[in-house]
Regions:
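Short, acidic/polar
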Residues: 68-85, 158-160, 299-306, 335-338, ...
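N-terminal carbohydrate-binding accessory modules
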Residues: 11-91, 309
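Acidic/histidine-rich helix-loop elements
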Residues: 49-76, 104-109, 150, 273-299, ...
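Surface-exposed, active-site-proximal loop segments in enzymatic domains
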Residues: 58-66, 98-115, 139-154, 186-201, ...
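An active-site-proximal structural segment forming one wall of the substrate-binding cleft
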Residues: 27-28, 71-92, 102, 106-137, ...
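Active-site region of glycoside hydrolase catalytic domains
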Residues: 155-293, 304-324, 347-350
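Aromatic-rich peripheral "rim/lid" segments of glycoside hydrolase catalytic domains that contact
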Residues: 22-25, 329-391
């Protein structure tokens, strides 16, 4: 996600008395008995440290560490990550934007920034959590842009960044997962969020992303050590399901001994009109009922397609981002959504990561669950619903 508004935390939890977690029964699919599928199963459910290390600025910062809390308003603490683990989350997705913190032709990352990222990563590793580390909001023409004109530039940037990250985190075991890039897309075009495979520029973008992903795998594997066998995640165009379901998307090749260690990354805030669209926009809806097909159909169809193309063919899938924004206190619908989404994902053999941007007030993308100021769960019933079906 790209929402940048910093919101103030309220002092008390949202009242959720009278809200019930629905009973959801989805017949589980046959999941291949492979190490990769078991690995994703063990990731259980994850939580995104959103609007934090992924924050970016157009201004020069004397203290670039302050960017960490410039969007979310709070510096990350061990107490926060401990609370995430205690709630039952087993994976931390750690989105990081790097371009405000690099210098020189080889994009040398600021030691202070890299140290701070590692410090927070260690909070989760010390809690025996999985951590997904990525390149996040570096998706523009100066850094990573998926067209042929910028292909060489993009490959250069990603190579130098991933060489440094692979070196810094190479001694960590498989609990640390590398994700090539976040939501690669044609920024500021009509196709930014709408992939049209009849458009030449979209086909070209998909082909460039294929090259990025292959280069990412090659660069990481080449560094050896634990990186030679580390689990790696790769997205398609804008990390959408369509981005990996179209015929032009190609999964990177890997060494024979690493079969099943490339994880397909998908972001899916669906159904869109409920989960992501602003409440003030036309066609936005604020109701979701886990027992009604009209609510669940988009989720069912996406899961089925991902299962058919990937899971059934022993290729693991991770939903790197999902969630439903608060729309004027529609808590019961969000609880229904959380329960159904996770129940479906687990039945189809996938793990999911809720996008939490610490946003609770205003008219922006209100995906916050953990109030980072008070380190309390503002919507414990949503968390309970996620955990009930994540096993």
């Amino acid at each position: 996600m790209i929402w940048q508004q910093k919101t103030e935390s309220a002092e008390t939890e949202t009242e959720d008395s009278g809200v019930a977690i629905p009973e959801v029964v989805i017949e589980p699919k046959e999941i291949p008995d492979t190490d990769g599928m078991k690995f994703v199963r063990d990731m259980k459910i994850g939580w995104n440290l959103g609007n934090t290390f992924d924050a970016i600025t157009n201004a020069q910062k004397e203290d670039d560490l302050s960017i960490e809390w410039s969007w979310c308003g709070e510096k990350t603490t061990k107490e926060m990550i401990d609370a995430v683990k205690a709630a039952g989350f087993k994976t931390l997705r750690l989105p990081v934007s790097w371009h405000n913190h690099v210098s020189g032709d080889h994009y040398t990352i600021s030691e202070a920034w890299l140290d701070r990222v590692q410090e927070v990563l260690d909070y989760a590793v010390d809690d025996d959590m999985y951590v997904i580390l990525n390149i996040h909001h570096d998706t523009d023409k100066e850094y990573c842009y998926p067209d042929k004109e910028h292909l060489e530039q993009s490959l250069s940037y990603m190579t130098f960044i991933w060489e440094q990250l692979a070196d810094r985190f190479g001694d960590y075991d498989e609990h640390v997962i590398f994700e090539s890039i976040n939501e690669p897309r044609l920024v500021e075009t009509d196709h930014e969020w709408w992939l049209d495979m009849n458009a030449a520029e979209c086909v070209e973008a998909v082909e460039c992303i294929n090259e990025w992903n292959q280069n990412f795998v090659d660069v990481v594997r080449k560094t050896g050590g634990n990186n030679a066998t580390r689990y790696l995640m790769v997205p398609g165009y804008d990390a959408s399901a369509d981005g990996v379901l179209n015929d032009k998307f190609v999964l990177p090749t890997d060494t024979a001994e690493n079969e099943g260690k490339i994880l397909v990354s998908v972001h899916a805030y669906i159904p869109y009109h409920f989960a992501l669209q602003a409440a003030t926009e036309n066609e936005s809806i604020d109701q979701f009922n886990a027992s009604e097909k009209t609510s669940t159909n988009d989720i069912d169809q996406m899961m089925e397609k991902l299962y058919a193309k990937y899971i059934s063919n022993e290729i693991p899938v991770v939903i790197g981002e999902f969630g439903a924004r608060d729309k004027n206190g529609n808590l019961q619908s969000r609880v229904d959504y959380a329960a159904y989404y996770i129940a479906a994902a687990r039945a189809y053999g996938m793990s999911c990561n809720w996008w939490d941007n610490n946003a609770f007030t205003g008219d922006g993308e209100l995906f916050g669950l953990l109030d980072r100021k008070t380190v309390t769960w503002r919507y414990p019933k949503i968390v309970d619903a996620l955990m009930k079906y994540a096993e």
